């Protein structure tokens, strides 16, 4: 059994991870940690997340001694804020742990990126260079050898899974950037109380227009520029991305179909829809990404749907664990 600790276990993603680790036949839960100043320290995780009652009732421990915690673990899941992950990861890695970071701290290898989009200077360039981007369907070979996996963001997951088959097969017009409009539920903002994510205050609205940190993440790993506009929706969980593209000259519907089927026929977490478009209801509380598309003339619209807390975070992290240690890819997920 691989001893597994979750850092930042009090949040929505941490709770999902705790349940997955509990269900996994080859993982054991060695610790649920929160920060020293967390108001939740000492509480049972099931006190915060009632669905875990009688299943995972362990107490949330303050992370006081990082080196000691590292010595007691094989696998670390960082469900922490970006700068917290940045500061913690190296200690776990230097103690030989395999780290799966759900923050953005190690996703993009571009000079100046972290100071511009995350507000801090990256201090661990060597680990940033070694980090493997954990888009499970597209990077399995590298994930299987990695010590540090940077689990993608929720919007980048939905966007890249929809676009990568088209970009790889060179089916898109390179002179016109794909336009991504994506809407997320309020759990994407985390568990901490905020007026902007309060149910009575949320109204469908774009945010981060032209400057959201996920735009350069998508572009960096997709290999082409995009226009990305996120929206906040008044529902709990899920992401729906609607992507408008222009096809390269002469591309046929058959080529598009073949590109998606070649990419995803053997990937159980991606479901290709025929004659229908994805909807959040079908992926909510599942590890799946549903993809549908329609062609009209030289334009193609692709739609993808995921659960932002699962395929957009915790279940993708678990997919990466399964790939890294040679377990079936959906172990503990269905």
UniProtKB/Swiss-Prot annotation:
Q: Which UniProt keywords apply?
A: Amino-acid biosynthesis, Arginine biosynthesis, Cytoplasm, NADP, Oxidoreductase
Q: What is its main location?
A: cytoplasm
Broad class of enzyme this protein falls into = oxidoreductase
Concerning CDD domains, the annotation shows: AGPR_1_C, AGPR_1_N
> What's a single GO BP term from this record?
L-arginine biosynthetic process
Q: Which Pfam families match?
A: Semialdhyde_dh, Semialdhyde_dhC_1
Q: In which pathway does it act?
A: Amino-acid biosynthesis; L-arginine biosynthesis; N(2)-acetyl-L-ornithine from L-glutamate: step 3/4
* Gene Ontology terms: cellular component: cytoplasm
Q: Which PANTHER family match?
A: N-ACETYL-GAMMA-GLUTAMYL-PHOSPHATE REDUCTASE, CHLOROPLASTIC-RELATED (PTHR32338:SF10), N-ACETYL-GAMMA-GLUTAMYL-PHOSPHATE REDUCTASE, CHLOROPLASTIC-RELATED-RELATED (PTHR32338)
Family according to the record: Belongs to the NAGSA dehydrogenase family. Type 1 subfamily.
Q: What does this protein do?
A: Catalyzes the NADPH-dependent reduction of N-acetyl-5-glutamyl phosphate to yield N-acetyl-L-glutamate 5-semialdehyde.
Name the record gives this protein: N-acetyl-gamma-glutamyl-phosphate reductase
Its source organism is Aliivibrio fischeri (strain ATCC 700601 / ES114) (Vibrio fischeri)
Instruction: Give the source lineage, highest ranks first.
Output: Bacteria, Pseudomonadati, Pseudomonadota, Gammaproteobacteria, Vibrionales
């Amino acid at each position: 059994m691989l001893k597994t600790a979750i850092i930042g276990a009090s949040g929505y993603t941490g709770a999902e991870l705790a349940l997955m680790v509990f269900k996994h036949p080859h993982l054991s839960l060695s610790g649920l940690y929160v920060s020293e100043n967390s108001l939740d320290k000492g509480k049972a995780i099931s006190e915060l997340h009632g669905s875990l009652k009688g299943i995972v009732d362990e107490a949330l421990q303050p992370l006081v001694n990082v080196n000691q915690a590292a010595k007691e673990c094989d696998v670390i899941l960082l469900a922490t804020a970006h700068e917290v992950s940045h500061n913690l990861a190296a200690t776990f890695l230097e103690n030989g742990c395999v780290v799966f970071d759900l923050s953005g701290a190690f996703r993009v290898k571009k000079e100046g990126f972290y100071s511009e989009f995350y507000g801090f200077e990256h201090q661990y360039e060597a680990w940033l260079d070694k980090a493997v981007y954990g888009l499970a369907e597209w990077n399995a070979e590298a994930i299987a050898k990695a010590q540090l996996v940077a689990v993608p963001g929720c919007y980048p997951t939905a966007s890249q899974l929809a676009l990568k088959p088209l970009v790889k097969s060179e089916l898109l017009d390179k002179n016109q950037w794909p336009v991504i409009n994506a809407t997320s539920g309020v759990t994407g903002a985390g568990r901490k109380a905020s007026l902007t994510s309060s149910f009575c205050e949320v109204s469908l609205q774009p945010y981060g227009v032209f400057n959201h940190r996920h735009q350069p993440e998508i572009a960096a790993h997709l290999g082409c520029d995009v226009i990305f506009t996120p929206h906040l929706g008044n529902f709990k969980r899920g992401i729906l991305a609607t992507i408008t593209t222009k096809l390269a000259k002469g591309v046929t519907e058959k080529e598009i179909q073949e590109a998606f089927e070649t990419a995803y026929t053997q990937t159980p977490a991606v479901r290709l829809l025929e004659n229908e478009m994805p909807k959040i209801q079908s992926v909510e509380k599942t590890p799946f990404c549903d993809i549908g598309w329609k062609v009209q003339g030289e334009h193609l619209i692709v739609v993808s749907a995921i659960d932002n807390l699962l395929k957009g975070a915790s279940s993708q992290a678990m997919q990466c664990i399964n790939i890294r240690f040679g377990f079936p890819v959906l172990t503990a997920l269905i």
